[in-house]
A protein has these predicted regions:
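Short, internal strand/loop/helix patches
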Residues: 90, 104-139
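Short active-site neighborhood of thiol/selenol oxidoreductases, capturing the structured segment around
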Residues: 46-69
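Bacterial N-terminal signal peptides
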Residues: 7-15
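Structural microenvironment flanking redox-active thiols in thiol-disulfide oxidoreductases
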Residues: 69-108
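N-terminal "domain-start" segment that seeds a small globular fold
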Residues: 20-47
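Thiol-/selenol-based redox modules, centered on thioredoxin-like
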Residues: 137-174
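Bacterial N-terminal signal peptides that target proteins for export
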Residues: 1-7
Length: 174
């Protein structure tokens, strides 16, 4: 009986083990066809962005905080390389457009930041929500979309190595 419990415990630990940042998993399902407002107040239709090429959609808890800044700047620093491969990048958080604009301008981010104060995009991507007092925050996550399909997802996304993770996955999915 003890042996069965130990084996069952080991099996469950393996199956339910926590993901480490940057590992993610290969998947294949339709990408959410949502829309949101960017830092300039313009509506961004995600399905239209997906048609332009591979798309990285990353979620971060709060604009202009240390971990979120590392994640966003990692993608900023690799943006020229990613763009050569036709990759589009969208960042999403619960922040309002004015906070997204300040974050984008402060760190010269070359891609749109989408305001999702009601959490509709967060919900569509099944990103975990965290509560900090009265604030709702999106758990750091990242998705790679190709041809309208999510092909990779990472619900434990890296901060400063986000771009490296994306480049690795892009190379594996060519």
């Amino acid at each position: 009986m003890k042996m069965r419990l130990l084996m069952l415990s080991a099996l469950l630990s393996t199956l339910l083990g926590t993901a480490r940042a940057g590992e993610g998993e290969k998947v294949s399902y339709d990408a959410p066809a949502v829309s949101g407002v960017n830092q300039d107040g313009a509506t961004v239709n995600f399905a239209d962005v997906y048609k332009k090429g591979p798309t990285v959609v990353f979620f971060y808890p709060k604009a202009d905080t240390p971990g979120c800044t590392k994640q966003a700047c990692s993608l900023r620093d690799a943006f020229a390389d990613l763009s050569k491969d036709g990759v589009q990048v969208l960042g999403v958080s619960f922040d309002k457009p004015d906070a997204q604009k300040a974050f984008k301008d402060k760190f010269t981010l070359p891609y749109d930041l989408i305001a999702d104060p009601e959490g509709k995009i967060v919900e569509a991507f099944k990103v975990e929500k965290m509560a900090r007092g009265l604030l709702s925050l999106a758990k750091r996550s990242c998705f790679l979309i190709k041809d309208g399909k999510v092909v990779w997802q990472d619900y434990a996304a890296s901060t400063d190595k986000q771009a490296e993770d994306i480049k690795r996955v892009l190379a594996q999915t060519k």
